[in-house]
Amino acid sequence: MEVMNEQSETACFDVDGVRYRYLYMKEDDPARSRRRTPVLFVHGFAQDALSWFPTSRTIFLERDVYGIDLVGHGGSSVPVHPAPYSLPAMGEALLALIELIPGKPLVVAYSMGGRVALSALLEVGPAAFAKQTSGLLLESVGMGPKTQAERDAAIKRDADMARRLRETPLKDFMTYWENLPLFESQKALPKKVRAAVRANRLANDSEALAKCVECAGQHRMPSYRETTAALRDLGLRGYPALYLAGEKDAKYSKLAASLHEEGIVRTRIAPKVGHNVHLEAPEVFAACVHSVATR
């Protein structure tokens, strides 16, 4: 999904022998840039940093913006060994990039990227995470299994998905993927947008995606109790955080309602859209980002 302009640049960093690419766009006015919170985007499954940039143009005009390519995606390494695909390993890479960014970034993470962000939070703990970052926006992110039965079901789903990735051509898998109920609302998007999303998905490596599912799928998450305790701790520290879900995304809008009722984190339901709010409602998404940014 090549939408980079003349202000876009890429760079790389290494963690435990794995090379990660990231993209960044600088605000035109350096003085204003220093006054505004930078934003760090963490993409979802079968995406890359570029997948953020067709949306929410207002963010890119007002702030320095960074986007990481997670392992096995985009321009980052595609290791043979499974270890780098684990949530802790990807969380460590995210923390390494956070250290490279001037200023404390607002971390905006979608779906699988949210699992990575939560892993980073749990790795260093809420106190340290709050010192390293200025805020957290989680978009359509699972919070981990509540029970062993839920974990067992996730293990089966993820194993089935990894098997499908290995046994079918990628284009056939992506046809299956984009027809899941989770993405039904995206069928209302313009044909050009849907074609770009599909091309972005097809640019991936099937084996790398299978390893991501096996090593960083829902079944690999810490428990719901552990992740929500960390989020609640952030809130008690006055740390700005937001959970965002689409109204048409039955699973994650229900989760958002639960998080709100339990007083774990501030939530927002985007009307008339599904799982990918930043793609389907970029103006709403941009407003949410600015609402979490501290300055």
Tell me what each language-model feature is:
Residues 16-78:
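Conserved HGGG/HGGXW glycine-rich cap/lid loop of the alpha/beta-hydrolase fold
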Residues 42-44, 110, 245:
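The conserved beta1-alpha1 loop
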Residues 88-105:
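Conserved acidic catalytic loop of the alpha/beta-hydrolase fold
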Residues 109-113, 117:
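Gly/Ala-rich beta-loop-alpha elbow adjacent to hydrolase catalytic centers
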Residues 119-122, 130-166:
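Flexible "cap/lid" loop of the alpha/beta hydrolase fold
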Residues 148-152, 164-230:
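Conserved alpha/beta-hydrolase catalytic His-Asp/Glu region
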Residues 234, 238-273:
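Conserved loop-alpha-helix segment in the C-terminal half of the alpha/beta-hydrolase fold
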Residues 273-286:
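Catalytic histidine-centered segment of alpha/beta-hydrolase-like enzymes
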